[in-house]
Amino acid sequence: MTDKTSLSYKDAGVDIDAGNALVDRIKGVVKKTRRPEVMGGLGGFGALCALPQKYREPILVSGTDGVGTKLRLAMDLKRHDAIGIDLVAMCVNDLVVSGAEPLFFLDYYATGKLDVDTAASVITGIAEGCSQSGCALVGGETAEMPGMYHGEDYDVAGFCVGVVEKSEIIDGSKVAEGDVLIALGSSGPHSNGYSLVRKILAFSNTDPETTQLEGKPLADHLLAPTRIYVKNILSLIEQVDVHAIAHLTGGGFWENIPRVLPDNTQAVLDESSWEWPAVFGWMQQAGNVSRFEMYRTFNCGVGMVIALSAADADKALRLMNDAGEKAWKIGVIKASDSEERVVINA
């Protein structure tokens, strides 16, 4: 072999300098999420975090999630600013259903070719989501993997750890006949059902940037960041006895509400009691999607469902609306041995 060419990692498609530039870009926004329990700074081999001293019997709660094919739509439309918020929301909203306070968050960002501006936009969104939920962004991994992803396409995953007092874990065991169900409104499809969203766009030959809905581009509705409920729900838990919380994600109403119901109970909902944001009506019509499929795929305007005693329902409703949530009484718990765990009356 006579060729004396000296190959570098950059020749192979991995730009270490770009990775370092990204770290420099995000240091400031990451620092703003710091909690007093966090020890050390960004860049260590492992992140250290103490448990808050207020807990007598602290139980750690963990979760991981992604953003699904909402990423594909964001990449196609070159809108990346809300994706980081979505990522945090999917994790911390899962944690808070057990009554847990999120402590820290880590992210994984993988791409074929690192675009510093895009990655910085996503991670800035992650930091914003952490600020909204009160957890610290303590670290992450940026993986530039040529040949694994097409060009600047990327994927993200999030990992969150929270803590709850052992005696205050919310697990659905208190749910009983007569409990009232309160819904907290969603900001849109959140981060679920986007394979169907994209199919509807293609099926109806719709350009989400030029199609208007309620005076703004359809893309604004579809890429609205997932609402983060953590602080308002933690405040509610301190003031009323919450029996169960369901986060409406993949599987919609039919699969998520039963996850927190005891045996021999049934959730009976009144469809007219809450508002469907316009984007759901548009999708149902444009894709000729059945009512059953809408409720199985999307949150249809409901991000969280909270079960509590009828005596606490009015107070909880007032607290949530005063805190800035859109909240409605949407149903009740009934005793039932039916396999149909959720009934939605039109």
From Swiss-Prot:
Subcellular location per the Swiss-Prot or TrEMBL entry = Cytoplasm
Q: Indicate yes or no for the key word Ribonucleoprotein.
A: no
One cellular component term from this protein's GO annotations in UniProt: cytosol
GO BP, sorted A to Z: 'de novo' IMP biosynthetic process; adenine biosynthetic process
Q: Quote the catalytic activity from the record.
A: 2-formamido-N(1)-(5-O-phospho-beta-D-ribosyl)acetamidine + ATP = 5-amino-1-(5-phospho-beta-D-ribosyl)imidazole + ADP + phosphate + H(+)
* A Pfam family reported for this protein in Swiss-Prot or TrEMBL: AIRS
Could you cite one Gene Ontology molecular function of this protein? phosphoribosylformylglycinamidine cyclo-ligase activity
The membrane-spanning stretches of this chain are: none
Write down the EC number.
Answer: 6.3.3.1
Give the UniProt keywords, A-Z.
ATP-binding, Cytoplasm, Ligase, Nucleotide-binding, Purine biosynthesis
Q: Could you tell me which pathway this protein works in?
A: Purine metabolism; IMP biosynthesis via de novo pathway; 5-amino-1-(5-phospho-D-ribosyl)imidazole from N(2)-formyl-N(1)-(5-phospho-D-ribosyl)glycinamide: step 2/2
Extract the HAMAP family matched here. Answer: AIRS
Question: What does the sequence similarity comment in the record state about its family?
Answer: Belongs to the AIR synthase family.
Protein name, entry field: Phosphoribosylformylglycinamidine cyclo-ligase
Protein's organism: Erwinia tasmaniensis (strain DSM 17950 / CFBP 7177 / CIP 109463 / NCPPB 4357 / Et1/99)
Please name the taxonomic classification of the source.
Bacteria, Pseudomonadati, Pseudomonadota, Gammaproteobacteria, Enterobacterales
Write the gene name. purM
